[in-house]
């Protein structure tokens, strides 16, 4: 899939300057309205436009029963971009009483990455610790690991694989390099439809980066065939949070992303050394011409998540534009806010103890597994 001549798939984003409006036209999604934003819980990711589009958002907002699906592939340590979406999902759970399903696609990383099972296992355990530290309600949350929960995911993926045609696979994802890659869209569909297969048909929302929308589209196509007791999952599409180095998608690479395990000193060093400011050539020029918040990564991080107070953010923006606040001072301010957030997250992370034991409360029950298998005809 391309936007303005640039490739955009779940596995490749070959542009640092995406035209998000053209992406919507190509993907067939709708821009969020002011009314929709107002009906979400007060949150900077929605209020300030990082979540900018969606599918069937009104249906989710008016539903009496709701589920959210948002996952992660264990390909490295989790970074701030991951954390923002998971903490947003927790906010929806707190405000709406929504269920949250979190799939971890360890199989995907074996098929798509040059990564050994042992490496994936190490990342998986670390990612699980970070997920549990978010503070989801275990009564309303299910964490699913593809290989550990294959007893339920494989029958679902088997059922859905027959509904994903090769032409669809090529059109949405391109030509797969191996059979695992060809099968994975059926696994992803199992992730996105799982809450309804367990609890019955109801509204489901997938908060997801815009490059991951192809997974949602395939699952909606499967649901639309009406062979199973599910409705089409909705989506809330997110623009990319830039890497510290500037425009483009944040990655898990050391040095260009802030990891959830980074120490305060590491955060400050990364922000001071790597954070792009689009800055002026000198302090004197900055004082005279001011900064450009739209190009400044530390400001964008504050706007997206780390400064929830609109009045305070407006003050920071005003002083930066006027040249009264220097780029280095803005970097220090952003680093302070990020380290405050990480300190609280890391305290919860350290207090968890054994991850396997902590995970038990979040796993699918035997009854839930059976209901899902029954729903697709593989309950025998």
UniProtKB/Swiss-Prot annotation:
GO terms for biological process: tryptophanyl-tRNA aminoacylation. Its main location: cytoplasm. A motif ('HIGH' region) lies at residues 74-82. InterPro entries: aa-tRNA-synth_I_CS (IPR001412), aa-tRNA-synth_Ic (IPR002305), Rossmann-like_a/b/a_fold (IPR014729), Trp-tRNA-ligase (IPR002306), Tryptophan-tRNA-ligase_arc (IPR020653). It is found in: Cytoplasm. It comes from the Archaea. Pfam families: tRNA-synt_1b. Its EC number is 6.1.1.2. GO terms for molecular function: ATP binding; tryptophan-tRNA ligase activity. GO terms for cellular component: cytoplasm. Keywords: Aminoacyl-tRNA synthetase, ATP-binding, Cytoplasm, Ligase, Nucleotide-binding, Protein biosynthesis. It catalyses: tRNA(Trp) + L-tryptophan + ATP = L-tryptophyl-tRNA(Trp) + AMP + diphosphate + H(+). A motif ('KMSKS' region) lies at residues 249-253. Belongs to the class-I aminoacyl-tRNA synthetase family. NCBIfam families: PRK12285.1-4, trpS. This is Tryptophan--tRNA ligase 2. The gene is trpS2.
